[in-house]
Amino acid sequence: TFVKYIEEGKGGWIGFHHATLLGEFDGFPLWQWFSDFMGGVRFQNYIAPLADGTVLVEDKKHPVMKGVQASFVVPDDEWYTYDKSPRPNVRVLASVDEATYTPASDIKMGDHPVVWVNESKKARNVYFQIGHSKRLYETEDFTKMFRNAINWTLGK
């Protein structure tokens, strides 16, 4: 039912953080369709303890990014890394500058998108890799993106 909803554009979808914890966990196989929907990524690692990081807006013209600063700090987040960048398969709206992690971390993936949409699906969709810490929901730029995402996925 979810696949049909997304493939046929029956509505919109907003995903957060844990949605890309993709792999074989607790005896469950990877859901290949959803991995493809998320840009073909497979969860690799994450940065612990939580770290601040600077997010760089790459696509200022997308409605989800309307009114969002060109860069902003995301506090205390758990930054996932993947086996590869989803960039070839999705439209990247923002990425994290891994050199800004505080505290610093050796866990990096290079090209590190953190907000994207998959335009190969009819449903309007947006995924936010950020979202582990409640502090994110207190930041102006994220709450603006989130409101924009709600309106955009609803077609408003």
Regions picked out by a protein language model, each given a short descriptive name:
Residues 1-67:
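A glycine-rich, often tryptophan-bearing local segment used as a flexible ligand/cofactor-contacting loop or short
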Residues 5, 33, 46, 80-82, ...:
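Sequence-level detector for tyrosine residue identity
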Residues 8-13, 87-91, 122-124, 156:
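Loop/turn elements at helix/coil->beta-strand transitions in domains of secreted/extracellular proteins
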Residues 13, 19-23, 70-72, 98-100, ...:
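Solvent-exposed loop/turn segments at secondary-structure junctions
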Residues 30-39, 74-76, 82-90, 131, ...:
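Oxidoreductase and adenylate-handling cofactor-binding alpha/beta cores
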Residues 40-122:
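Catalytic beta-strand/loop cores that center a nucleophilic Ser/Cys/Thr
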Residues 99-156:
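Extracellular ligand-binding/catalytic regions of CAZymes and related secreted enzymes
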